[in-house]
Amino acid sequence: MDIRVEYLSTSKTILFAGSELRYYLSKINNMISFSQDTEQTDETYRKKICLGLFPDSECSSDEDEYEIEISHLSGHIKGSNPRSVLLGVYQYLTLLGCRFLRPGKEYEWIPSVPHIEEIQISRRQKARYRHRGVCIEGADTPENILEFIDWLPKLGYNSFFLQFELPYAFLNLWYSHKNNPLKKPEAFSLEKAAEISSVIDRELQKRSLKHHRVGHGWTCSVLGQNTLGWVPSDTTLTKEQENMTALIDGKRGFFQGIPINTNLCYSNPDVIASFAEKVTAYAMLHPEVDYLHVWLADASNNHCECDTCKKHLPSDLYVHILNEIDRALTQKQLDTKIVFLIYEELLWAPIEEKLLHPHRFVMMFAPISRTFLQSYEIPEQLPAPVPYQRNQITLPVNLTENLSFLAQWQKIFHGECFDYDYPLGRAHYGDMGYLHISRIIYEDIHRLTDLKLDGYMSCQELRCFLPNGLPNYIMGKCLFGTDCSFEELVEEYFQAAYGKDWESCFSYLSRLSSLCNCDYCNGKGSRQNPAVAKNMKQVAQTAETFLSVCAAQDKAALPPVQQLFWKHLDYHREYCILLSKALFLLADGRTQEAGEAWKTFTYYICSQEDTFQKALDVYRVVEVSTNYTGFPLIENF
């Protein structure tokens, strides 16, 4: 069968979509061949697939929509922009039976479709939400990042957020092999990070993915510091620089020694001017960035207590700076979109200031302290937020309380707004089956419209695939829009990943999820918890029982992708046994024994990291478990 792919546009993204279409169709049916692509129409070719854009009146750079009309391997895939054409190609392949289960081609289920020429597909679909993305966290290799970017549009995502001016912090966490004493640190530099960043930029542009950038780090720039991550600095600030930092307990300087956690004296005219200048200069140099995130420092209870600052809410000072940035960008005739953050102290809405040009801005709701035991529910009446007390706040866990803060901001800002959420940042380590956290994601996304939020950005590790990639799979599908129930999406995923025995895997992982507590592992509540202890004992028993299912599986008879998923499930089984033992002892109040069990678990995952590097972020598991769950840091074995 000879097919010609015809391009109705010279867009690089549409050309890339064509190359992807050719690659996967040739995998689906090895009888398919492709004639040389050309822009010229030649009716002698009976089978032709055209890729192009809708008429100008139906095009939009922001709203993703595609149309698939293909019968007998002839027809078209069109979109509202080049990215939408690429999304349409991947949806066509999905309708043919392809399943993109994890980043990396080895984790794709590609069916054999012998009579593909008999298939007729007709679909037109518009994305349910405008903002559909993932933000980098954890320790990452360049390959981890690039494979994740390649995976995003296959599931319907349209955005990627590369935090900081350079992704040095996340790459260096990998190359330094922090939290894995079994691996030797490797040299890494800002120069190398810049090289990798350029490659990442090109891959985003190839797919026309919306490029989000920076976030935290502007406060470092104002102080003349590089953003190297959440690490201490021994730099001595000049007197002028020190006077720019927040006054806390009568002292100025780096907050707890960490530049990125250091807020500034935001009433200081020099700080305001420098902040606006830094953002404007970056925007001028980086027109490829679609959404420039302008945040303050990380951490909480670290705002300036000088006589001028303490007269104002942090959010009032923040909005004043945002207006100055808007004014500077306007003077330079830059239309850069600025994303501002509702987070920690900034949850309290301003009472004095307002954004003068709301169309410039996108509001991002970031409920970092929320519970993941439940999904969002909207009560008939929201309570009033607790009064703000400078540097004495307690972050809200309750979802209703979090939503009360959002509601106050939505009274004064009526522009674009999306949810920046954290199910795959820390909480997922507390759900060993990944079914609970996947359902939370499913339910949260289906409630975004009711919350007046136009999308979702997941702040997460790029290596969160143990036991599988179901959470991100469901996230992408739901954000673009699906009529499938949660159960239908799970079945679709598990059938492709595990084959004929998928129901055994589903029952097993569901049981694990039912026994787990995301919030406990995320540091919420007392460390001594009889219910958690009881459940962790059952987790170990459940995992040990599943050994017989793994042993009975004739893995050699499975397709390669399913062999990989079963291999990961076998590793994951031992992971669960060792981790649940440590959690049982911790929750039972046997701290010393818990530390020993934690050391055994840590050695296991560190020793296996090379084999399962793409599935589990060892650095992040250890970081979360020592900073939040309550285990000791193991520096050597």
Residue ranges and their predicted role:
Residues 1-128:
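Contiguous, structured surface segment used for ligand recognition
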Residues 10, 57, 128-406, 410-413, ...:
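Aromatic-lined carbohydrate-binding surfaces of glycoside hydrolases
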Residues 38-39, 46, 452, 477-637:
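Catalytic domains of carbohydrate-active enzymes that cleave complex glycans
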Residues 16, 87, 273-274, 504:
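Short, solvent-exposed alpha-helical surface patches in well-structured domains
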Residues 29-32, 100, 215, 333, ...:
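Long, hydrophobic, amphipathic alpha-helical segments used as structural scaffolds
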